[in-house]
């Protein structure tokens, strides 16, 4: 079954009490007065940033073949401690934290391996050699399974305990970012055909094909409240979908280049999106209105909101004055620089 993107009441559909509360909260967040801080440590550009489930640690994955874990104080200016995770022999393209454990992190690399690390010791505890260069990775919300996508459009699902493949599937089309919904019963794949393929989990049977965009879909984010998913596309648009109806309820139009990365904040009231445009857009999910733009100096690779605070980590292709990779990421949302 194919679902056409019918747009439901595009500007500000009837709001629930909860949504009104989120809009009230917007008035309390002085985005214009907030600052970004730089975090330097990698030798080459950073491809991926991700927060742990408690919002106290941030991991960064880099072309320099390492990941790093940083202790972040949301309200402090304390000394930033970081620990290096070494072992991959190619770029660390994406990483994600165990949603139930604040110190376990999984990394996907071009060296064909997926590794599980303990962020306290910096040691690799599990490793799986897969069939191709891994570029996308995500955890099931209960922390029991990890899904990995590679450059050859193959999906592998690993059992976290044994670190062995449970499912393998090769697709005959371009598969980009992947995600479970908040229940873990639905698995979503973005594709180069402009669709989102919706599969039931664990059977991986096709439930739906959502015709989301006129160009390839690159990235996907799930609203933490489980109400929506958002899709970023090569057509420069971000679309917002009601997950129960599979209807498009909003589009965000501020970017002009293919959307590379998107993220919902912890309330689900804001969405950040980034591309090769030299700013990150933050928009109100319910009104579709852009509320702030964070200037950047390069194309962005990864944005992710903290799960507890309005802190947004972001990383891109920043160069220094000698045109070498800066190896930096930044966090926006501090009251002082």
Can you describe what each PLM-predicted range is?
Residues 61-64, 107-111, 149-152, 190-193, ...:
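Conserved strand-to-loop turn within each blade of WD40 beta-propeller repeats
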Residues 301-337:
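Blade-level signature of beta-propeller repeat domains, shared across WD40, Kelch, NHL, RCC1
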Residues 67-72, 114-118, 155-159, 196-200, ...:
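WD40-repeat beta-propellers
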Residues 1-43, 48:
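Intrinsically disordered, low-complexity acidic/Ser/Thr/Pro-rich linker and tail segments
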Residues 39-46, 85-92, 128-134, 169-175, ...:
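WD40/WD-repeat beta-propeller blade N-cap
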Residues 49-55, 96-102, 138-143, 179-185, ...:
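Loop/turn segments within WD40 beta-propeller blades
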Residues 36-38, 81-84, 123-127, 164-169, ...:
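A short beta-strand motif characteristic of beta-propeller blades
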């Amino acid at each position: 079954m194919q679902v056409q993107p019918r747009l439901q009441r595009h500007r500000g559909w009837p709001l629930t009490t909860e949504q009104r509360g989120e809009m009230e909260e917007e008035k309390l967040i002085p985005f214009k007065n907030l600052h970004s801080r730089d975090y330097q440590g990698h030798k080459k550009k950073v491809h991926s940033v991700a927060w742990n489930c408690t919002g106290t640690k941030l991991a960064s994955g880099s072309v320099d073949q390492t990941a790093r874990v940083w202790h972040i104080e949301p309200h402090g200016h304390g000394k930033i401690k970081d620990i290096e995770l070494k072992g991959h022999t190619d770029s660390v393209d994406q990483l994600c934290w165990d949603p139930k454990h604040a110190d376990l992190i999984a990394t996907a690399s071009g060296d064909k391996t997926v590794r599980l690390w303990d962020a306290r010791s910096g040691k690799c505890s599990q490793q799986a050699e897969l069939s191709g260069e891994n570029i996308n990775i995500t955890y099931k919300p209960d922390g029991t399974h990890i899904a990995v996508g590679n450059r050859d459009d193959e999906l592998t699902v690993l059992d976290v305990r044994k670190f062995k493949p449970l499912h393998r599937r090769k697709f005959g089309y371009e598969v980009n970012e992947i995600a479970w919904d908040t229940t873990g019963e639905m698995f979503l794949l973005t594709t180069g055909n402009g669709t989102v393929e919706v599969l039931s989990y664990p059977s991986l049977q096709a439930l739906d094909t959502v015709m989301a965009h006129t160009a390839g879909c690159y990235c996907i984010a799930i609203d933490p409240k489980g109400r929506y998913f958002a899709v970023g596309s090569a057509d420069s648009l971000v679309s917002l979908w009601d997950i129960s109806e599979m209807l498009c309820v909003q589009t965000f139009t501020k970017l002009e280049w293919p959307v590379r990365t998107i993220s919902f904040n912890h309330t689900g009231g804001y969405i950040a999106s980034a591309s090769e445009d030299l700013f990150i857009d933050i928009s109100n999910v319910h009104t579709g209105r852009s509320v702030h733009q964070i200037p950047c100096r390069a194309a962005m690779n990864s944005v992710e909101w903290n799960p507890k605070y309005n802190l947004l980590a972001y990383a891109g292709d920043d160069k220094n004055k000698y045109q070498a990779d800066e190896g930096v990421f930044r966090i926006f949302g501090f009251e002082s620089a």
